[in-house]
Amino acid sequence: MPKPQQVITWRDKTPDGFRFLPKINQMISHMRRLNNAEMLTEEYCDSIIQFEEKLGMVFLQLHDNFGPKNFDLLANYVEKFPKAIPLAVELRNTEWFNNESVFSKAYQLFETEGVTNILVDTAGRRDLLHMRLTTPNAFIWYVGANYSESD
């Protein structure tokens, strides 16, 4: 977890117009799985807010086994996340995309809360390209792995 002074140092070393898109610490996303993560999230946000005008969007990459059964944890987390900090979420578990009602419920949550859905372009997972925008901003995650023929 970066300390506020470290964030200030990074901010001050970058040119005007530069934007940081920091990933939420894995202690929150993977170890706590968004459960009882309020204090850690507050500490994280207190640090990254020091990016000031250079803060682009914060992204939450969920564990690949964080599926729809954890919807309530996800909803609680994004509903409480500070609205002054733009948030994007990457749903990695395929169960989010296999059922239209689950898919719609997750995206409705994101649209309601102003959370950007991360669009993922991953070799071997072209099925994920069906995802939709949930805010006016696009966050596209290009993931390369051993450069498959489809890349």
Where are each of the predicted segments found?
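Residues lining hydrophobic/aromatic ligand-binding pockets adjacent to catalytic sites
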Residues: 1-151
